[in-house]
A protein has these predicted regions:
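Short, electropositive, low-hydrophobicity segments enriched in small/polar residues
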Residues: 20, 56, 95, 124, ...
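A contiguous, basic/glycine-rich beta-loop/short-helix subdomain that forms a polymer-engagement track
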Residues: 33-108, 134
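Well-ordered alpha-helical segments embedded in enzymatic catalytic cores
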Residues: 7, 98-102, 129
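Alpha-helix N-cap/helix-start motif at coil-to-helix transitions, marked by capping-box chemistry
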Residues: 2, 6, 94, 179-180
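Short, internal active-site loops enriched in acidic
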Residues: 27-30, 60-63, 153-155
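Conserved alpha/beta enzyme-core scaffolds, especially Rossmann-like or related mixed alpha/beta domains
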Residues: 1-51, 106-120, 143-151, 197-211
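Catalytic adenosine-cofactor/nucleotide-binding cores of aminoacyl-tRNA synthetases and other
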Residues: 103, 107-212
Length: 212
């Protein structure tokens, strides 16, 4: 973290972004706030134990919300809702448990009236689950938590998609992109249609003619 966070801050500064506060997930575990949040869900009757793990009744929470929204039991059944593990059999809490605690902290401790998250579209399946967990805690996630999904971007160079792979470590970072394309062009391309999957044409971004 001591190496990566300063690099992140430097890269974001080049893009024109500065965060006012950095929050460490580890602080939630060290303070016992994750355990306290899970205990709060248990006190409200929204957890159960199975196979040595502690589970959140996600399917029940979401079904209750959907019924209030007018969905029929038949329609809800077709969704195949599933429950989520909060604490594994080995005693370690899941990322989802920490995520619930983090958002509970924003509402219940830091006093946020509204929280807006910006996520990649590949996390769309997590939206209803997190909102539901806030509802289960009495924090009105349906109205106080907004989640904006940003689509993924394909980089195109000389008419070919630039192939990237997590497995092989082949990637183009933001700072790599800013070495090739002016920051204003990057910001324009990314903000033009954030809700739509797009191709970022590196050649077009630096071209100075009527097509750009």
């Amino acid at each position: 973290l001591s190496v990566n966070i300063p690099k992140m801050k430097s890269d974001l500064a080049r893009y024109g972004i500065q965060y006012d506060q950095w929050f460490f997930e580890s602080s939630l575990h060290e303070s016992g706030y994750v355990a306290d949040t899970v205990a709060a869900l248990t006190d409200k009757g929204y957890t159960y134990e199975k196979d040595g793990a502690l589970w959140l009744k996600t399917s029940q929470i979401l079904a209750e919300n959907l019924r209030r929204a007018g969905k029929s039991d038949e329609a809800i059944e077709k969704l195949g809702l599933k429950d989520d593990v909060l604490r594994r059999a080995n005693g370690f809490y899941t990322y989802f448990a920490a995520d619930i605690a983090y958002h509970r902290n924003k509402f219940a401790v830091r006093g946020f009236d509204k929280v807006i998250n910006i996520w990649g579209a590949d996390h769309h399946g997590h939206v209803a689950r997190l909102k539901g967990a806030m509802d289960a805690l009495g924090l009105d996630g349906a109205h106080r938590l907004d989640i904006v999904l940003m689509q993924l971007v394909k980089l195109v160079q000389d008419g070919e998609v630039v192939r990237m792979s997590k497995r092989t470590g082949k990637a183009v970072s933001l700072t790599d992109l800013l070495d090739m394309v002016p920051v204003d062009a990057c910001r324009y391309f990314f903000n033009a249609k954030p809700e739509t999957q797009m191709e970022f044409d590196l050649g077009l971004a630096v071209r100075e003619d009527s097509e750009n």
